[in-house]
Amino acid sequence: METASHSTEAKTNYLNADYGIKSWLLTTDHKRIALLYLGSITVFFFLGGFFAMLIRLELLTPAGDLVLSDTYNKLFTMHGVVMIFLFLIPSIPAVFGNFLVPMMIGAKDLAFPKLNLASWYIFIIGAGFILYAILTGGLDTGWTFYTPYSTTYSNSNVVAAALGVFITGFSSIFTGLNIIVTVHRMRAPGLTWRRLPLFIWAHYATSVIMVLGTPVLAITIVLVALERLFHFGIFDPRLGGDPLLFQHLFWFYSHPAVYIMILPSMGVMSEVIACFSRKRIFGYDFVAMSSVAIAVLGFLVWAHHMFVAGISTYAAMIFSLLTFFVAIPSAVKVFNWTATLYKGSITFETPMLYAFAFIGLFTMGGLTGVFLGAVAIDLHVTDTYFVVAHFHYVMVGGGVTGFLCALHFWWPKMTGKMYPEAFAKLSAVLVFVGFNLTFFPQFVLGYMGMPRRYHAYPPEFQVLNVMSTAGASILAVGFLMPMIYLAWSLQYGKEAGPNPYRAAGLEWMTASPPPDFNFDETPVVTWEAYNYDEIDGTKKGVEVVG
């Protein structure tokens, strides 16, 4: 009977409810739209990774023998723009937020299904402008578009890239609005705020940042394009403008944007750590509120990127102090995850390996961020490879590792197939080892004084650069492996079943892959979040059935 039931479910899941390209391109099913995003950002991830490998190959030798200096400027710019705006910012919210938020709260879809589809098309249009800029000579301003270089001196295609970033911003805003309204209005009966999965809390906080912060970036980028075309004199000091105004506006969005990339990963960690330690999350309320605190404090620390830009000493001291404060809610999360692991029944499936990697790498990134928040240290290492290493420990060690963790954890739910565990574990180890070999030497390089964005360097730095390039090669293999074995699993993987990990949460109470509208009947929630003691029968008074 069970086999027959699963067979029936397989005939009616969201993947085969309709066929043909048109059914995918016009779908309003949040799960299909999530897969459209997944396919898109995967392409951009490997495009950005290709630029990164060219950068590392250029830095193998002190003279920089691979490309010209102007080409090198374009490589690190295009790497940053593609990775940040076309992968990291949309990655978890657009893929797993889209796929999981409705199922986690017992809804049949997001609040605005057509707006959700429009968000993906807007993202693709914006990405098209950025790709056009790349194909017509590239961009050399750095991903930050700093003025007055971007508005006056750069000979690259700044306007097309700026329009691309502007357009993709609307996709981010619409995704955030959709998630906020869905969480407020479409929760299942009994699913109170204090019963919500921490994944939902993290995405809710992220969505608030998207809605409030992204318009500032959009306006700023449009001003850059207009100044470049019409010389309005907003940022150009020769025309009475103020280049520092651009930095204030840009970082007012771009520091909270760090949390757009990290907060969703933190939500993933809470789900995975609770599942594979078979425990309730320690200090649920504190972890939930820390997401809100990060969203609020993230808007108050933007000027710590500007300690050497000419802001007053008084302002630098204030923003330095606020930078120390913003580390507290992140530290609360790390402490509570660690406490959850204590005396847990821990198993080491692939998602848990990525969770451990996240905790270690993100902690390293966070601690070095506190160093950079201290003005005296920042003056010494700003614009060196110390900043590059810190940024990548947060963005890759946090954002990309969290994405891979989520991909492996929910892959059976998304596809109904299991991946080969041995290859997945090998990939996780290669990512961890390759990442540390790539970026830890860069802390040393930065402290020794090697500036970033230079295509040539003194011979004394070569050994550490060779180590970094070797690590990048290992990291590339670790990133390529999941694409291969996950694609293989679609055809040859074992059937997953509804809940292969015996996980808590409403998304595991429907078929794998889920049916069109997620649930045959609206679920009624009568239990607390992360009730693994009840699931495993270890709670006092709960009997194990069967």
Sequence positions of predicted segments:
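Membrane-embedded and interfacial regions of multi-pass energy-transducing membrane proteins
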Residues: E2-G546
